Amino acid sequence: SGFERVFVGEESRGSITGLHNWVQFYLEETKGNVNYLGWTGRQDRHADDDVHVVTVKFSWADDDPELEVKPMSTMLCGSTVEFEFAALTLAFLAGDQNGDTKLALGDEQLRIVCHAMRSKFGAHVGSAYFELA
Protein backbone atom coordinates (compact mmCIF):
# COMPACT_ATOMS: atom_id res chain seq x y z
CA SER A 1 0.00 0.00 0.00
CA GLY A 2 1.00 3.63 -0.33
CA PHE A 3 1.14 4.05 3.45
CA GLU A 4 3.58 1.17 3.83
CA ARG A 5 5.72 2.37 0.95
CA VAL A 6 5.99 5.94 2.30
CA PHE A 7 6.19 5.38 6.05
CA VAL A 8 7.65 1.87 6.40
CA GLY A 9 9.47 1.18 3.14
CA GLU A 10 9.08 -1.81 0.87
CA GLU A 11 11.11 -4.03 -1.37
CA SER A 12 9.57 -4.28 -4.80
CA ARG A 13 11.01 -6.13 -7.78
CA GLY A 14 14.45 -6.26 -6.21
CA SER A 15 14.71 -2.59 -5.25
CA ILE A 16 13.89 -0.44 -2.23
CA THR A 17 10.82 1.76 -2.58
CA GLY A 18 9.68 4.45 -0.21
CA LEU A 19 11.01 4.76 3.34
CA HIS A 20 10.48 8.53 3.41
CA ASN A 21 9.84 8.83 7.17
CA TRP A 22 12.69 9.90 9.45
CA VAL A 23 11.29 8.03 12.50
CA GLN A 24 11.16 4.70 10.66
CA PHE A 25 14.59 5.38 9.17
CA TYR A 26 15.96 5.96 12.69
CA LEU A 27 14.30 2.81 14.06
CA GLU A 28 15.62 0.68 11.20
CA GLU A 29 19.10 2.12 11.70
CA THR A 30 19.11 1.37 15.45
CA LYS A 31 18.13 -2.25 14.65
CA GLY A 32 21.07 -2.49 12.27
CA ASN A 33 18.86 -2.88 9.18
CA VAL A 34 19.76 0.46 7.59
CA ASN A 35 23.28 1.56 6.80
CA TYR A 36 23.31 5.35 6.39
CA LEU A 37 25.63 6.29 3.51
CA GLY A 38 25.32 10.09 3.56
CA TRP A 39 23.00 12.94 2.73
CA THR A 40 22.75 15.81 0.30
CA GLY A 41 21.08 19.16 0.71
CA ARG A 42 20.59 22.21 -1.41
CA GLN A 43 23.85 23.64 -2.63
CA ASP A 44 22.81 27.23 -1.82
CA ARG A 45 22.62 26.52 1.92
CA HIS A 46 25.22 27.17 4.58
CA ALA A 47 26.23 24.42 7.00
CA ASP A 48 24.55 26.21 9.93
CA ASP A 49 21.14 26.54 8.23
CA ASP A 50 18.27 24.63 9.79
CA VAL A 51 17.60 21.95 7.17
CA HIS A 52 14.35 20.00 7.57
CA VAL A 53 14.20 18.20 4.23
CA VAL A 54 17.14 15.94 3.53
CA THR A 55 17.96 13.50 0.77
CA VAL A 56 19.72 10.42 2.10
CA LYS A 57 21.53 7.49 0.54
CA PHE A 58 21.38 4.17 2.38
CA SER A 59 21.43 0.42 2.15
CA TRP A 60 18.69 -1.67 3.72
CA ALA A 61 19.07 -5.31 4.69
CA ASP A 62 15.46 -6.02 5.71
CA ASP A 63 14.91 -9.79 5.29
CA ASP A 64 17.19 -10.01 2.28
CA PRO A 65 20.76 -11.00 3.18
CA GLU A 66 22.04 -8.94 0.25
CA LEU A 67 22.14 -5.24 1.10
CA GLU A 68 20.47 -3.04 -1.47
CA VAL A 69 21.41 0.61 -1.95
CA LYS A 70 18.77 3.29 -2.37
CA PRO A 71 20.61 6.21 -3.96
CA MET A 72 18.07 8.87 -2.94
CA SER A 73 15.22 9.11 -0.46
CA THR A 74 13.88 12.42 0.79
CA MET A 75 12.58 12.91 4.31
CA LEU A 76 11.02 15.73 6.28
CA CYS A 77 13.00 15.56 9.53
CA GLY A 78 11.54 16.45 12.92
CA SER A 79 7.88 16.28 11.92
CA THR A 80 5.26 13.94 13.33
CA VAL A 81 3.87 11.01 11.39
CA GLU A 82 0.41 12.53 11.84
CA PHE A 83 1.47 15.80 10.19
CA GLU A 84 3.13 14.02 7.28
CA PHE A 85 0.18 11.67 6.80
CA ALA A 86 -2.28 14.59 6.78
CA ALA A 87 -0.18 16.81 4.47
CA LEU A 88 0.55 14.02 1.98
CA THR A 89 -3.07 12.84 1.94
CA LEU A 90 -4.40 16.38 1.49
CA ALA A 91 -1.96 17.03 -1.36
CA PHE A 92 -3.05 13.82 -3.06
CA LEU A 93 -6.79 14.45 -2.66
CA ALA A 94 -6.81 18.19 -3.37
CA GLY A 95 -3.90 18.47 -5.78
CA ASP A 96 -2.45 16.67 -8.74
CA GLN A 97 -2.55 12.91 -8.10
CA ASN A 98 0.41 12.35 -10.40
CA GLY A 99 2.43 15.47 -9.90
CA ASP A 100 3.40 17.90 -7.24
CA THR A 101 1.78 20.39 -4.88
CA LYS A 102 3.58 23.41 -3.48
CA LEU A 103 3.67 23.94 0.28
CA ALA A 104 5.19 26.75 2.35
CA LEU A 105 6.40 25.43 5.71
CA GLY A 106 7.89 28.29 7.69
CA ASP A 107 10.62 29.77 5.51
CA GLU A 108 10.90 26.61 3.41
CA GLN A 109 9.26 26.22 0.03
CA LEU A 110 8.46 22.53 -0.41
CA ARG A 111 6.92 20.31 -3.03
CA ILE A 112 4.83 17.29 -2.21
CA VAL A 113 5.34 14.75 -4.99
CA CYS A 114 2.50 12.24 -5.44
CA HIS A 115 2.25 9.10 -7.54
CA ALA A 116 -1.15 7.46 -7.95
CA MET A 117 -1.84 3.75 -7.93
CA ARG A 118 -4.97 2.86 -9.88
CA SER A 119 -7.31 -0.05 -9.35
CA LYS A 120 -10.91 -0.86 -10.19
CA PHE A 121 -11.83 1.12 -7.05
CA GLY A 122 -10.17 4.33 -8.29
CA ALA A 123 -6.96 6.18 -7.52
CA HIS A 124 -5.01 5.53 -4.32
CA VAL A 125 -1.74 6.90 -2.99
CA GLY A 126 1.04 4.83 -4.51
CA SER A 127 3.77 7.03 -3.09
CA ALA A 128 4.11 10.58 -1.80
CA TYR A 129 7.03 12.49 -0.35
CA PHE A 130 8.42 15.94 0.36
CA GLU A 131 11.11 17.70 -1.70
CA LEU A 132 12.66 21.14 -1.53
CA ALA A 133 11.13 23.36 -4.20
Regions found by a protein language model. Give the residues of each.
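Compact beta-sheet-dominated globular domain cores
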Residues: E82-A133
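N-terminal "domain-start" segment
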Residues: S1-A104
